Swiss-Prot record:
This is Myoglobin. The gene is MB. The lineage of its organism: Eukaryota, Metazoa, Chordata, Craniata, Vertebrata. Monomeric heme protein which primary function is to store oxygen and facilitate its diffusion within muscle tissues. Reversibly binds oxygen through a pentacoordinated heme iron and enables its timely and efficient release as needed during periods of heightened demand. Depending on the oxidative conditions of tissues and cells, and in addition to its ability to bind oxygen, it also has a nitrite reductase activity whereby it regulates the production of bioactive nitric oxide. GO terms for biological process: removal of superoxide radicals. It is an enzyme of class 1 (oxidoreductase). InterPro entries: Globin, Globin-like_sf, Myoglobin. It comes from Anas poecilorhyncha (Indian spot-billed duck). O2 binds at H65. Residues 2-148 form the Globin domain. It comes from the Eukaryota.
Amino acid sequence: MGLSDQEWQQVLTIWGKVEADLAGHGHAVLMRLFQDHPETLDRFEKFKGLKTPDQMKGSEDLKKHGVTVLTQLGKILKQKGNHEAELKPLAQTHATKHKIPVKYLEFISEVIIKVIAEKHSADFGADSQAAMKKALELFRNDMASKYKEFGFQG
């Protein structure tokens, strides 16, 4: 299920545009995640008070966490599938501390694709979207495998 060199190039090219505004993209991703999948908000103690889009928009903590999420994902994507060193500590905290189900990783993957498509429609066509979906699926599958190693069925 690996990606070709061309697919990785497509992923990393669009990711460069994401990195140009990590705060904006990260904030948009988390806002959309919590709006589309409100059950995910329960996993974030410090964000539970954010009930409305306006509250989410004004939250500096949410913005900061969005940067953290996309920074970590970017480090993993840049490894082009050879991401064991980056993935293991992330999987460990998500499995043992935060207890984030794999289903929620699917949700955020879908949201990431939507947000990138909205912000960069001219640069994120069908081929790039397919490559990104594949890269995020690889990430999720590897996270799920690591979860099992840590005794979390997710």
